Curated annotation (Swiss-Prot):
Pathway: Metabolic intermediate biosynthesis; acetyl-CoA biosynthesis; acetyl-CoA from acetate: step 2/2. The keyword Acyltransferase applies. Keywords: Acyltransferase, Cytoplasm, Transferase. This is Phosphate acetyltransferase.
Length: 329
């Protein structure tokens, strides 16, 4: 983790990227905000009831003098953001509905990003993934040419660094969806300084098993390779389908997939379903001892990232750094 953060911190030095932390009444978030404020990487904007935040700060002896605190219920920005929301959701939300929605810290924070008052958002310490992602999908929306957002995790232990996806967002994926996630994950890997070798995972290696699920991954591989070529991702390798051991162990790859472009040296893993991805990253985290940073959402016009409700202060800090780095891309 230290290597990734040090690379990102070098890129962020002096940038003071404005990142919204909507859950300012959560002590983990507030402590992380004070730590971030001491850097020149991130300038946090904390949302919540100001009295509650100040009481929490007093309890933990935190200095808030340099931190911007906004209470959505009383903010002078509320009317401006309501009007912008109604315009963005034209025909889908009345002004009265917008006023009510923007009392919600995640909607308010997402509108700060959409209107350019902030550059990214990190939430989820006290909210579900849906509560964090829904406003982003409605307001910020996906990039041109991208039909969905997806969630990747950086899996880090010592010098080892991998990307797992999709582990958080899409419960049902067809071949086209898997292909899109593979290409977006490759782009994410590149943007964080990795040389992407993307393995499309299955319970089959290079046709060793036959089923509709295997066929879906094989079709996704072909589509992903075509999309990568169309997007001119010249230095990206995408191959499959692989069982996990064939994707990560050279001696196994030599036996199961001789001649494959990836010979046990994959660093980006695209799981065939959300169940597999979510279970896989948690096994690596809990049994393998890997730090799991994320989910980092990809495919949006501006970065919005989702914490686990079991996150630590360190997780909030780290994901804020990653979000700031995304904002500069």
């Amino acid at each position: 983790m230290a290597d990734l953060l040090s690379v990102l911190q070098d890129k962020l030095s002096g940038k003071n990227v404005k990142i919204v932390l909507p859950e300012g009444e959560d002590e983990r978030v507030l402590i992380a905000a004070t730590q971030l404020q001491k850097t020149d990487y991130v300038s946090p904007i904390v949302l919540g009831n100001e009295d509650n935040i100040k009481s929490l700060a007093s309890k933990h002896a935190l200095d808030l003098t340099q931190i911007e605190i906004i209470d959505p219920a009383t903010s002078e920005l509320k009317d401006e953001l309501v009007d912008a929301f109604v315009e963005r959701r034209k025909g889908k939300a009345t002004k009265e509905q917008a006023v009510e929605l923007l009392d919600n810290v995640n909607y308010f924070g997402t509108m700060l990003v959409y209107t350019g008052k902030a550059e990214g958002l990190v939430s989820g310490a006290a909210h579900s993934t849906g509560d964090t992602v829904r406003p982003a999908l409605q307001i910020i929306k996906t990039k041109p040419g991208v039909s969905r957002t997806s969630g990747i995790f950086f899996m880090i232990k010592g010098d080892e660094q991998y990307i797992f996806g999709d582990c958080a967002i899409n419960p049902e994926l067809d071949a086209q969806g898997l292909a899109e996630i593979a290409v977006e994950s490759a782009k994410s890997a590149q943007s964080f300084g990795m040389d992407p070798k993307v393995a499309m995972l299955s319970f089959s290696t290079k046709g060793s098993a036959k089923s509709d699920d295997v066929t879906k991954v094989q079709e996704a591989l072909k589509l992903a390779q075509e999309k990568a070529e169309a997007d001119q991702l010249d230095h990206v390798v995408i191959d499959g389908e692989f069982q996990f051991d064939a994707a990560i162990v050279p001696s196994v790859a030599e036996k199961k997939a001789p001649g494959a472009k990836i010979q046990g040296d994959a660093n980006v893993f695209v799981f065939p379903s959300l169940e597999a991805g979510n279970i896989g990253y948690k096994i690596a985290q809990r049994l393998g001892g890997y730090d799991a940073v994320g989910p980092v959402l990809q495919g949006l016009n501006s970065p919005v990232n989702d914490l686990s409700r079991g996150c630590s202060t360190e997780d909030v800090y780290n994901l804020s750094i990653i979000t700031a780095a995304q904002a500069l891309q």
